[in-house]
Amino acid sequence: MDGTVTLSSTPTAIPPVSALDAGKPTLPPEAPLAMPEQNLREGSLQVRHQRTSPPGIGMRRFYLIGGTFAATAVAVWVMLSVLWPDGISVLEGCLLCLFTLLFAWIAMSFASAVAGFVTVVARAGRKLGIDPEEPLPTLRSRTALLMPTYNEDPRRLLAGLQAIYESVAETGQLEHFDFFVLSDTTREHIGRAEELVYSELCDRVDGHGRIFYRRRADNAARKAGNVADWVRRFGGRYPQMLILDADSVMTGDTIVRLVAGMENNPDVGLIQTLPAVVNGQTLFARMQQFGGRVYGPIIAFGVAWWHGAESNYWGHNAIIRTHAFADHAGLPSLRGRKPFGGHVLSHDFVEAALMRRGGWAMHMVPYLQGSYEEGPPTLTDLLIRDRRWCQGNLQHAKVVSAKGLHWISRMHMLIGIGHYFTAPMWGLLMLIGIGIPLAGVGIDLAGDLPFSPARYWHGSSQGNAIWIFICTMFVLLAPKLLGYIALLLNPRELRACGGAFRAAVSILLETVLAALMAPVVMYLQSRGVFEVLAGKDSGWDAQVRDDGKLSWPALLRSYGGLTVFGLFMGAVAYAVSPALAAWMGPVIVGMALSIPVVALTSLRRTGMALRRAGIFCIPEELDPPKVLVRASELRRAAVLEPSLI
């Protein structure tokens, strides 16, 4: 007998297995755990100051908010000096309001990045007794690794899980772990393929009784409902659960240290890692993973520095205390119709906020490496996923006022909402920039305008206008600069990124490509916001993992309208003034060239050619961890197998 049990009955509090599972589930005996639905209109913050909160957390947050306010106040004062000489019109007043909000947005990111840079360079920020340089701790409790999936290629999915399983086994502590494949697949042929590949995996690694599989008959509430179903049925057996994504890979060493961190800190409810993006092959995927590897730590260490014990949850590559999650993270259905009503889409932010309300500490450990994920292969795939995130984040407008939330939890949600509203705000800023001269404000259309933004905005404050531009660009680009400096101070990682020169070329090329794609992102994010506000639901589709091929008809359908709009905006700007057209050139060019830029960055051969030249290299490519090598081997072997889907 291999220890595997297929359930035939359940307690009366849980529906019969036949109603819960499709196909042929292979599951352990149930250990039910109550997970009540939370009330957003009632509740109070249980613990105001956490034991594990870093010292001086109040001053850290004062620095962030005070620094943001001070920098924004100076920038607004200088902008006023540019606009004030002839009085401020209605359009200029709108411009000033937008500028204030947008500068505050980038100033806060800058202040956080500076804190992150100092933390990275000082090799500080370690917490919860989790030290990757110490000997591997011995575990005392049992942990479940959960891998939710939805219409994914099962061979690819379980290749990653096998690599994780083998890595955990190499730590010598496999007996403390069980693995669950939690399928929400709706396509019957993929479901049957999952069962076959799962059975092959168990045979291959002798995982019977340790690796389990089930497919929900009703995938209500998407991923959040998938995990909640497991918690309610099996959570009572496991003090911790580690949530993976379909493309997640983690080392056994990192997993063991996360579990030990939970065991040694009984008041901690969640520990979030910083997943490094790997395995990119297209130009777009490679520039994204390079940026995440070089700038990502600066940003992540910064937010972890001021988040303290009120960190956020990103939905995967994180370990969670099961009973804390069950007690406080049962999500209610929001009132109203979609897209704002119904099930909570971006569930991770809300679950973290509710757990913190319940008195549990939430931490992020960006210094703990060995946590990986994959990025979308093309800008189109990123924007499809981003549209779903847009709806989920805007839906938080119904949650942010919930009773008893910690103010930092509310701030997380407001930042998430603001992330999507900045896109239409930048667009409005650009349109007002053309609207002011068209309205005859502060410009002589018949006059000779030299190339000077200050002459465009009133001739008397040229120095201040240029100063605003330089400062804005510096604040925008500072995280990249700080990331490069931190890389220079780490010789080992610098070599792995191709050396100082190639890393600098990579950063420059990434900045240029990102600038060209920024108008595309701005346009489509703005459209996404308006679609959500108009009541259009995003749906739920499986993600593209590998192939970055895009057909020209698909590109024309997706970006043809944006190309025409960019050409039209360029013509209008040139009609107003060649100087204005030149000043708006980066935005206009990005829109007008959206089709070739997206096509170029979607090519695998372009990305791999740059890799051979040492551009966009990351340490995980020069010296890949064993778990990534193994996952890649298994996925390559899976490609050679007959297709099951």
Curated annotation (Swiss-Prot):
<feature type="region of interest" description="Disordered">
    <location>
        <begin position="1"/>
        <end position="22"/>
    </location>
</feature>
<dbReference type="GO" id="GO:0009250">
    <property type="term" value="P:glucan biosynthetic process"/>
</dbReference>
<feature type="compositionally biased region" description="Polar residues">
    <location>
        <begin position="1"/>
        <end position="12"/>
    </location>
</feature>
<keyword id="KW-1003">Cell membrane</keyword>
<comment type="similarity">
    <text>Belongs to the glycosyltransferase 2 family. OpgH subfamily.</text>
</comment>
<keyword id="KW-1133">Transmembrane helix</keyword>
<dbReference type="GO" id="GO:0016758">
    <property type="term" value="F:hexosyltransferase activity"/>
</dbReference>
<feature type="transmembrane region" description="Helical">
    <location>
        <begin position="559"/>
        <end position="579"/>
    </location>
</feature>
<comment type="function">
    <text>Involved in the biosynthesis of osmoregulated periplasmic glucans (OPGs).</text>
</comment>
<dbReference type="GO" id="GO:0005886">
    <property type="term" value="C:plasma membrane"/>
</dbReference>
<dbReference type="Pfam" id="PF13632">
    <property type="entry name" value="Glyco_trans_2_3"/>
</dbReference>
<keyword id="KW-0997">Cell inner membrane</keyword>
<feature type="transmembrane region" description="Helical">
    <location>
        <begin position="465"/>
        <end position="485"/>
    </location>
</feature>
<feature type="transmembrane region" description="Helical">
    <location>
        <begin position="580"/>
        <end position="600"/>
    </location>
</feature>
<feature type="transmembrane region" description="Helical">
    <location>
        <begin position="504"/>
        <end position="524"/>
    </location>
</feature>
<feature type="transmembrane region" description="Helical">
    <location>
        <begin position="423"/>
        <end position="443"/>
    </location>
</feature>
<keyword id="KW-0328">Glycosyltransferase</keyword>
<dbReference type="InterPro" id="IPR029044">
    <property type="entry name" value="Nucleotide-diphossugar_trans"/>
</dbReference>
<comment type="pathway">
    <text>Glycan metabolism; osmoregulated periplasmic glucan (OPG) biosynthesis.</text>
</comment>
<dbReference type="InterPro" id="IPR001173">
    <property type="entry name" value="Glyco_trans_2-like"/>
</dbReference>
<keyword id="KW-0808">Transferase</keyword>
<dbReference type="InterPro" id="IPR023725">
    <property type="entry name" value="Glucans_biosynth_gluTrFase_H"/>
</dbReference>
<protein>
    <recommendedName>
        <fullName>Glucans biosynthesis glucosyltransferase H</fullName>
        <ecNumber>2.4.1.-</ecNumber>
    </recommendedName>
</protein>
<keyword id="KW-0812">Transmembrane</keyword>
<keyword id="KW-0472">Membrane</keyword>
<feature type="transmembrane region" description="Helical">
    <location>
        <begin position="64"/>
        <end position="84"/>
    </location>
</feature>
<dbReference type="InterPro" id="IPR050321">
    <property type="entry name" value="Glycosyltr_2/OpgH_subfam"/>
</dbReference>
<feature type="transmembrane region" description="Helical">
    <location>
        <begin position="98"/>
        <end position="118"/>
    </location>
</feature>
